């Protein structure tokens, strides 16, 4: 856990917007995930929740009215190069992971909200302004399935969304990013958190742990890494590692891939670049 301190860039709040524009009701100051689109000079951050909630037992937190007030409702747009916050979007319901499209002319990203079970699109409009729009439900929102991790296939045609409470993964056709359509659903375990789609789109990897204080109890506290083959219609399990049995602790995140796969998809010609770096 060693490292060198570089800098602090404060997230906008109602009391100090740090020069950003508040586009809606909220400027809560929470920070969670971060993604960038360098060619558009874009950095996005989500807001999820704060330290006090992470330290609470999950069931206790859900029944604590005060704790439930301490969830974020925003995504912030930043100038990537200067780290200046530019715009605060209302994305109510605790947005977690942000994933940006891979295509060089696909200027949009997705996030999901844990408490309201929505998929949101963060996109650049025709005027070059970034906007946020709710585009789909995940499962039955009233049952709070709790969307956690998301993963975009490298061809930008499929978005995988995991829900922690029901242990399911869902696939959404995002050929039209403004109209995601669920096309597949499968239970992975009693609980599931992270998902990673391989670069060729033929495999999915899943891990189970959200964080120690929030993972389920008893037999439902499954800790695993599972791998599946995906043929475009169904998932077929290839292997599963029981982290509890192997005394490996909690399975949170995984990165499994091969460098050779990154040439599997030919990139489209770039249009309207704001910035470009040539590596020699």
For every predicted segment, state its role.
Residues 107-113, 117-119, 141-225:
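Loop/turn-rich, solvent-exposed surfaces of beta-rich toroidal or solenoidal domains
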Residues 17-24, 84-89, 131-141, 181-186, ...:
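A short beta-strand motif characteristic of beta-propeller blades
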Residues 195-280:
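Blade-level signature of beta-propeller repeat domains, shared across WD40, Kelch, NHL, RCC1
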Residues 9-16, 77-80, 121-131, 171-180, ...:
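Short loop/turn segments immediately following beta-strands, especially the blade-tip
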Residues 26-42, 92-108, 139-157, 189-199, ...:
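Beta-rich, blade/repeat-based domains predominating
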Residues 1, 46-70, 207-225:
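Short, conserved, GDST-rich strand-edge loop motifs in beta-rich repeat architectures
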Residues 4-14, 62-82, 220-232:
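Beta-propeller blade signature
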Residues 1-38:
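Asp-box/WD-like beta-propeller blade repeats and closely related beta-sheet repeat scaffolds
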